[in-house]
């Protein structure tokens, strides 16, 4: 009994739920893991001054949002582990997929510049870690830091370059190519089980994200099934030939 209580207290000290950007996320009080990600991605070299005291590690569980459209962003996020999908909410109530984020990706750089609310939704598709810094601290210590501003400028430039690509994907690429890219991006780490393809509700959401109809999505899934790329095991779709999907997907949504 004493051992159980001891382990509970240790876990409680390491993982503390906090409210971040309106969401209940998990703050990870693990300096070793935090320092690992800082070192892995050289986050301490982004700034001319030492910003490590202001860095924290947070964890998002699968399907939680890092940010939502219209919400104020108070932190600069560095996605250091996991994958997230970026999509916009349209005036007709539907959503449209833009891309997928993988490490290292900066989130909140646009809002840092324009001091405004988020204009897109970012939802993790697997458990993810982010190193976060309060924007208040960045504006206090790094607003005139040329090294940091150069890094942010590069990040914004990269996003601007990709905007034209994202905007043309739904117009120029057939659904089969876009679906193949989506399936690869949302697959589990061993490229077997496909996340989010478990019921009609998820398929409806996916059809909206890919800018197509529910029926067209089903027809295209059946085409991939006939080609031997995927199979359906009860309510779960599985990838059985990654190469077929990779040939179709190219670098869409990357």
Predicted stretch roles:
Residues 66-71:
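Short phosphate-coordinating micro-motif centered on Lys-Gly-acidic
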Residues 56, 65, 83-88, 106, ...:
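Short beta-strand segments in beta-sandwich/barrel cores
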Residues 8, 14-62, 101, 106-107, ...:
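Cyclic nucleotide-binding regulatory module and flanking cytosolic helices
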Residues 143-211:
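Polybasic "coupling" helices that flank or enter modular domains
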Residues 74-85, 104:
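Glycine- and acidic-residue-biased ligand/ion/polar-headgroup-sensing regions
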Residues 47, 97-157, 161:
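Cyclic-nucleotide recognition modules
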